[in-house]
Amino acid sequence: MGLKNINFFPTDHMKQNLAYMHERAPDGKLSIRPAGHLLRKPLTAKTPEEIKSTFNAGGAGCFAKPAEYAQIIATLLNDGVHAKSGNRILKKETVDQMFTNQIPEFPDFGRQGIDPPKLDLSNPLPELYPQGDLPQGWGLTFFLHQHPGPTGRSGTTGWWAGLPNLFWWADREQGLGGIIASQIVPFGDGAVMGLWGTVEAGLYQALQR
């Protein structure tokens, strides 16, 4: 895929362009987070021993340039083929399986909220993606819808989020996906989530023109 800026251990070049971690106070003001980045060890690990002793979580911990992360989303939309290079990264059946609900017997699993949270890391969220009492699903790697969302996304859309208020989605049915990326805690920031909804809804509206 030719991606240069995605890594669990940022290169020196990536560190030079690293966005500062911010936090929003209860009064709405933003400031640089005094404790620094949420993941300090990958940023400071240099020796083979330090790197080996660093835990890389499967669902979090990747540093990336949003434009390059978007190419991964586009590859999922294109049934596993990286459109820019024409290289097949995943088999279509693998992508199909990723977007198949693996836990139909647990329709409420995905809606488990964050309450009470650690207030320096997350706002209270009763649900991650409120849809009333409609069943929701979970693929091999992300939250899966079973019904259309209010922005226009299809009922087969996959999506997930990162703690510093990063939100991505991939709607294979309509061939549309994207990412909203910030470096702001706590999670569930109203301004960022509002921007996410506005941008996503605008894209779907543009498709209908």
Predicted regions mapped to residue ranges:
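Short, surface-exposed loop or secondary-structure junction motifs
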Residues: 1-149
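Short, glycine/acidic-rich beta->alpha junctions
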Residues: 54, 159-162
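Residues that act as N-cap/strand-start positions at coil-to-secondary-structure junctions
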Residues: 136, 162-164
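Short, hydrophobic/aromatic-rich segments at coil-to-beta transitions
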Residues: 151-158
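Active-site-proximal beta-strand/loop segments in catalytic clefts of secreted hydrolases
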Residues: 162, 181-183
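Short, surface-exposed beta-strand/loop micro-motifs that present aromatic residues
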Residues: 164-173
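Short hydrophobic-aromatic micro-motifs
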Residues: 168, 177-180
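Generic C-terminus detector
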Residues: 184-209
